[in-house]
Amino acid sequence: MSSGVQGGPAAHANAYQTHPLRDAASALGTLSPQAYVDVVSAAQRNFLERMSQLASEQCDAQPAAHDARLDDRPALRAPQERDAPPLGASDTGSRASGAAKLTELLGVLMSVISASSLDELKQRSDIWNQMSKAAQDNLSRLSDAFQRATDEAKAAADAAEQAAAAAKQAGADAKAADAAVDAAQKRYDDAVKQGLPDDQLQSLKAALEQARQQAGDAHGRADALQADATKKLDAASALATQARACEQQVDDAVNQATQQYGASASLRTPQSPRLSGAAELTAVLGKLQELISSGNVKELESKQKLFTEMQAKREAELQKKSDEYQAQVKKAEEMQKTMGCIGKIVGWVITAVSFAAAAFTGGASLALAAVGLALAVGDEISRATTGVSFMDKLMQPVMDAILKPLMEMISSLITKALVACGVDQQKAELAGAILGAVVTGVALVAAAFVGASAVKAVASKVIDAMAGQLTKLMDSAIGKMLVQLIEKFSEKSGLQALGSRTATAMTRMRRAIGVEAKEDGMLLANRFEKAGTVMNVGNQVSQAAGGIVVGVERAKAMGLLADVKEAMYDIKLLGDLLKQAVDAFAEHNRVLAQLMQQMSDAGEMQTSTGKLILRNARAV
């Protein structure tokens, strides 16, 4: 029988493969500590029961069924004769007593071993359970924090979306209000052009002001809602970043638990559905990115429109200021030309008066008239050739020493009086300068007619200054050239013959009007000389006043030029602001792209970790 058993297919099989505890033993490496304790306890009970059964059979001298052994192998015996008594029959009692003792010893030994093994397993199981519970509590806490952060980020994203929609609607309302303002402005302009009555114009103007007020309120609401949307968008971004940090903490805790408790820990512990919120967080962040991108685009469009409108307005103002500047410059040039013409006319009148006075002085003042004519012609020639008027240089000391201090004193008194009356400082100074020049001229004219001693002193100073300047002029190259020109002009034009003829004609004219006495001629000559002096002073005063007016116009032109430069700077500043807005938009998009790239890398790392765990897992 034994040979038959050995000769069958089971003879070539491994005893471990057919052992009843094979499955339990193979599962020891993958079971939890509690299951491991249960398996070992069952194996010990099975072993003790089997040992008790074998011991009782041997004590009763009864062979076990099928000669069964603990390892299910057949019991082999030496061949015996049929009639021969079994060996060792006399010491059956002793053998039975030895088997019982062996069973008792084995039982005690197994009891001790089992007790120590169970205690150790229980201790390890308790430690394992405590560590597992702590890890589970930590993971649960992190999972709850992650879930809360995800919910808050989602709620903030929804609030930001609603705020963005409200800001968009407010922007549309503001555009509609601007269109209403443009329509009201057009109706008002058309009414002004058509010349409608004042009551209709007032009604249209009131409607225009109301539309402007509504447009201002609409723009204020739009700006407030846009600021609120931006604030909520920033809050949503911060919450999304916080949720991402919580997710990273959860991933780190899971990786640490996997390394500490083995690769099969994730298989033994069911995965909490709260930890699978990466997809939800990705969706929330994607939605948040869409909102941020949309908000950045709208903000860029709004800034671009605002800067474009501001640039258009500044360009219109710049064009207007430029036109005003050109007009002021042209006005100043025309004023300067006009005053120059007036000065020339008065100069020729003075020359004519000098020639008229020659008739009553017997030709004595004709030389002065000729000199005046020569100076006038020479001044025009010098101005045309060199661009410099020597008459202006001659009169400059008079202006600096006499007229300017007098005009400044009178102007200061007038300015102080106007300021004391409540007039603006700048306007008072301008009016004082003009009135000072006029009052100075009037005073000199009045003094010339009255013949006061002060005028004589002034006249003496004027004559001394002019004599000195005239001497310097005649010694200079210009004076020498002027003398040569006058001589040539006299020779070519017959000025000497003209002078003699003029003297003869003047003598006849003097006799015709009844001026026979020398005293009468001198009296008329003095009167003509006074008239010439008065006209000369009036000419200088008018020229000074004209210079002041021209200076005022030039000052206005310079102010307009400053406004033009300021407008050009504003346009450049608006261009720089628009460039900064574009750079900020590009930076926001770059940050969002980097955030999404980090999320993608985190998802890829999580997938790789899952694949590694699955490869290292063993089937139970």
UniProtKB/Swiss-Prot annotation:
<feature type="transmembrane region" description="Helical">
    <location>
        <begin position="430"/>
        <end position="450"/>
    </location>
</feature>
<keyword id="KW-0843">Virulence</keyword>
<dbReference type="GO" id="GO:0033644">
    <property type="term" value="C:host cell membrane"/>
</dbReference>
<keyword id="KW-1133">Transmembrane helix</keyword>
<dbReference type="GO" id="GO:0005576">
    <property type="term" value="C:extracellular region"/>
</dbReference>
<dbReference type="InterPro" id="IPR006972">
    <property type="entry name" value="BipB-like_C"/>
</dbReference>
<keyword id="KW-0175">Coiled coil</keyword>
<keyword id="KW-0472">Membrane</keyword>
<feature type="compositionally biased region" description="Basic and acidic residues">
    <location>
        <begin position="66"/>
        <end position="84"/>
    </location>
</feature>
<comment type="similarity">
    <text>Belongs to the SctE/SipB/YopB family.</text>
</comment>
<comment type="function">
    <text>Plays a role in the bacterium-induced formation of multinucleated giant cell (MNGC), which is formed after host cell fusion, as well as in the intercellular spreading of bacteria and in the induction of apoptosis in macrophages. May act in concert with other effector proteins to induce fusion of host cell membranes.</text>
</comment>
<dbReference type="InterPro" id="IPR032391">
    <property type="entry name" value="IpaB/BipB/SctE_N"/>
</dbReference>
<feature type="region of interest" description="Disordered">
    <location>
        <begin position="58"/>
        <end position="95"/>
    </location>
</feature>
<keyword id="KW-0964">Secreted</keyword>
<feature type="coiled-coil region">
    <location>
        <begin position="309"/>
        <end position="339"/>
    </location>
</feature>
<dbReference type="Pfam" id="PF04888">
    <property type="entry name" value="SseC"/>
</dbReference>
<dbReference type="GO" id="GO:0016020">
    <property type="term" value="C:membrane"/>
</dbReference>
<feature type="transmembrane region" description="Helical">
    <location>
        <begin position="401"/>
        <end position="421"/>
    </location>
</feature>
<dbReference type="InterPro" id="IPR003895">
    <property type="entry name" value="T3SS_SctE/BipB"/>
</dbReference>
<protein>
    <recommendedName>
        <fullName>Translocator protein BipB</fullName>
    </recommendedName>
</protein>
<feature type="transmembrane region" description="Helical">
    <location>
        <begin position="355"/>
        <end position="375"/>
    </location>
</feature>
<keyword id="KW-1043">Host membrane</keyword>
<keyword id="KW-0812">Transmembrane</keyword>
<dbReference type="Pfam" id="PF16535">
    <property type="entry name" value="T3SSipB"/>
</dbReference>
